[in-house]
Amino acid sequence: MLRGMARLENLLGVQALAVVDRMTGNDLAPSESAALVTLLAHPGSGIGWLADVLGLTDSGGTRVVERLVAAGLLARRPGSDARSRVLELTDQGRTRAEAALSTRERELAQALEPLSDSERQTLERLLDKIVARLADDRPSALHACRMCDREACAAGAGRCPLEHTVPPGGLP
């Protein structure tokens, strides 16, 4: 591998970890913060679905949910049938998810601050290409975007580089 490429990869990795570290805070694991942010965008989801999005086993997803329920950030509610349960953020959980997204926005804005408008536009175009290759189906796109501000890539604000993973006609 070219030495310059290794340095670029290292710099991207350092920046990504710094943002995630600051988003999660001291009392939540990254998977717990990701669960809150994901459920903010997808309320009423089940544990199995959440585990898939987070890239966890079913038992790993259950442990994350148990910790969030114990912390008062998440509640289980009856699902559409007698056996199913859905997950809902509590008011405190919603506040924590929104705080994580605000921290993410602030940290990324600070990271981009030294760049000129032209450099930011160039970086956005380059990252569009990189991010578009992260997923080729909906489950992997949801995993890639588990800490995303969903409104930032909404129709009026731009286009999600992973929109190609949405089935024709939209999501069910």
Placement of each model-derived feature along the sequence:
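N-terminal leader segment of winged-helix/HTH proteins
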Residues: 1-26
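C-terminal regulatory/oligomerization modules of transcriptional regulators
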Residues: 121, 125-172
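Charged, amphipathic alpha-helical coiled-coil/dimerization segments
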Residues: 66-121
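Charged, amphipathic alpha-helical oligomerization/scaffolding segments
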Residues: 4-7, 11, 99, 122, ...
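N-terminal positioning helix adjacent to the helix-turn-helix/winged-helix DNA-binding module
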Residues: 4, 31-32, 92, 119
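N-terminal helix-turn-helix DNA-binding core of bacterial DNA-binding proteins
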Residues: 17-60, 71, 141, 160
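Generic non-transmembrane alpha-helical segments
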Residues: 19-23, 103-107, 111-115, 129, ...
